[in-house]
């Protein structure tokens, strides 16, 4: 009989941008197949100029497959390492009220909940399948159970542009790879302004994204935040990922 720990399923934090990953593999494998066919069977049957493209097909196909593998590594390994760095950058007491904007499968949410004793971690999302494979509140709750923090986690269906919370409700706001999914500039600004509204004076914000982080930082500075930094980029998902780390001024706005 297997030990109890080995029988308990590990938390599954999903594959980010599953359609993109699928397309990388489809294009890559197709290119490799075409290149192989041209190399093995094309000589004498097809024009030489066409056969000469076999190397390009194999090279391009291999690059797309590699990008798909990097995306999977980013989802399964890289983003968990980044999560740990982001969580470690927060000064925790244990009694914080935490909000995770666009929590998905709960990677940031659960990481924060593990740092809490009497506090509570609340995650909001609209659960879009194109953002993460099998994205649902049920999957997130299951992950919280597997990680032993279900009693410190709460989930709600909500749009980042209109958060259903009172002003100055949270000590810490987290977000990872979510706000770029709001495609218009005005909508992203609304989301950042909502984060500003619900965060307490002196509260901490840590936000990771693959695009628009300079816009987020500029909006925060325009709202009077003077402790705003952007970390150096990393390449978890091909496109550079940057983290915005900021603290809301203690003066009430």
What are these regions (language model features)?
Residues 1-60, 69-72:
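N-terminal auxiliary segments of SAM/dcSAM-dependent transferases
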Residues 93, 161-173:
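A short acidic, Gly/Pro-enriched loop at the edge of an enzyme's catalytic core
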Residues 94-104, 122:
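Conserved class I S-adenosyl-L-methionine
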Residues 105-117:
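Conserved SAM-binding loop of SAM-dependent methyltransferases across substrates and taxa
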Residues 116, 182-183, 199-201:
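Helix-to-beta-strand junctions that scaffold the AdoMet/dcAdoMet cofactor pocket
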Residues 188-201:
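A short glycine-rich, Lys/Arg-flanked "PGG" loop and its adjoining helix->strand segment in the class I
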Residues 202-209:
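Conserved beta-strand signature within the Rossmann-like core of class I S-adenosyl-L-methionine
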Residues 222-224, 229-253:
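Core SAM-dependent methyltransferase catalytic element
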């Amino acid at each position: 009989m297997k030990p109890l720990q080995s029988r308990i399923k590990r938390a599954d934090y999903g594959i980010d941008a599953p359609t993109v990953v699928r397309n990388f593999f489809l294009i890559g494998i197709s290119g490799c197949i075409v290149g192989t066919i041209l190399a093995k069977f094309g000589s004498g049957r097809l024009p030489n100029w066409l056969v000469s493209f076999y190397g390009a097909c194999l090279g391009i196909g291999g690059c797309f497959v590699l990008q798909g593998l990097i995306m999977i590594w980013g989802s399964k390994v890289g983003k968990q390492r980044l999560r740990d760095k982001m969580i470690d950058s927060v000064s925790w007491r244990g009694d914080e009220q935490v909000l995770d904007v666009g929590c998905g499968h709960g990677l940031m949410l659960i990481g924060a909940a593990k740092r809490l004793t009497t506090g509570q971690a609340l995650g909001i999302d609209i659960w879009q399948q194109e953002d993460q494979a099998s994205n649902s509140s049920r999957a997130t709750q299951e992950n919280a159970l597997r990680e032993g923090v279900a009693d410190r986690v709460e989930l709600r269906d909500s749009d980042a542009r209109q958060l259903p919370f009172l002003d100055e409700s949270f000590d810490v706001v987290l977000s990872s790879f979510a706000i770029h999914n709001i495609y218009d500039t005005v909508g992203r600004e609304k989301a950042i302004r909502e984060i500003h509204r619900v965060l307490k004076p002196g509260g901490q914000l840590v936000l990771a994204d693959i695009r628009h982080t300079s816009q987020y930082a500029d909006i925060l500075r325009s709202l009077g935040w003077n402790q705003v930094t952007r970390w150096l980029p990393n390449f978890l998902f091909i496109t550079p990922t940057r983290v915005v780390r900021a603290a809301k001024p203690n003066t009430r706005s």
